[in-house]
């Protein structure tokens, strides 16, 4: 997924037509941005600051370089991108495009819909009862495709790029969980060592680079 620098990708995404926007853009260099509950906005962009989209707000693309993104329940947004920060998404949120970060975690709560890919470099990914039209990718993060989630693309754990992968000692083995009644339609490709847990009720595409460990309970075994 990360074929061009994310800062450049962020600029590209914010230049695209906004998926849900019918209001004014908000563009800052320093400072946080809040999209107020129930209101409509265009694209939201800042360099140094977090972005908060309150419940049932509608926005275009949302992007920051240094800051986290929080989207509250029932909101509708375009693409979500940050470089240094996590992305936390509430319940019943519709995301028109993808969700990406370099250094930070991504979590999508129940009833979410992501219209594109979900990707991190250094950070975990967690989905609960969420539909993803694209795929999932990470380099060093854990991934949980939680109960009832449906990923129409694949799942890929990429080999670290030598430009940003400096390790001392043995690297941590990542944990990948495909939970109860979850579906990953596309291939699961692992370019580095992982522990892959797949629930007995889950369905996946072909698996390359790892051996699935089956589990039957509500939660995967602890390592």
Please tell me what each predicted stretch does:
Residues 1-223:
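Intrinsically disordered, low-complexity terminal regions
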